[in-house]
């Protein structure tokens, strides 16, 4: 069954289609995670509905708020930030295969506890420490973002999305 292997089965079938142009936002928190020269820095992206703005926090202690511009509003980016208002992006520091570090985009909800189809939908956000370990407060699972989001104290795998970046102050696209 070699047809069932490969990268087609490592990504979520939920499509965010999030597009952020950091050349217009100039957000330093997001830029730090989009920099290939700083692997191990991850940025959580959230939407603040009361401000119509992005809220960025990094696992290195940075945080910033950046208002939507007209293009963000036009694209409907407020509804494209993960399954429940949260994405984590960054270069993994243990993924260098000789061609550079791998850029990842993860959903910010625990893949074990969160159910997109549950009524009512309950949030199980992951918290990230400075080493790039994401922890669920509910099930206590820990996921290593630097190795692709594998669970390090149980079973499971982070929900990942296809993502590209054009550098710190370029375009971030998460599919």
Model-predicted regions and their roles:
Residues 9-125, 144, 160-175:
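N-terminal pre-ligand scaffold of iron-sulfur
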Residues 1-5:
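Sec-dependent bacterial lipoprotein signal peptides
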């Amino acid at each position: 069954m070699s047809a069932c292997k490969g990268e087609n089965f490592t990504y979520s079938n939920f499509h965010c289609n999030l597009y952020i142009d950091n050349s217009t936002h100039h957000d330093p928190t997001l830029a730090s995670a989009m920099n290939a020269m700083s692997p191990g820095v991850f940025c959580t992206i959230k939407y603040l509905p009361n401000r119509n703005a992005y809220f960025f926090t990094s696992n290195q202690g940075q945080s910033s708020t950046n208002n939507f511009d007209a293009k963000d509003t036009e694209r409907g980016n407020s509804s494209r930030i993960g399954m429940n208002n949260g994405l984590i992006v960054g270069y993994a520091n243990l993924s260098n295969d000789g061609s550079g570090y791998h850029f990842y985009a993860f959903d910010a909800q625990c893949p074990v506890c969160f159910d997109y189809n549950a009524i009512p939908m309950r949030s199980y956000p992951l918290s990230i420490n400075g080493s790039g370990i994401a922890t669920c407060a509910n099930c206590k699972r820990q996921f290593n973002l630097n190795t692709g989001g594998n669970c390090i104290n149980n079973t499971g795998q982070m929900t990942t999305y296809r993502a590209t970046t054009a550098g710190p102050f370029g375009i971030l696209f998460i599919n």
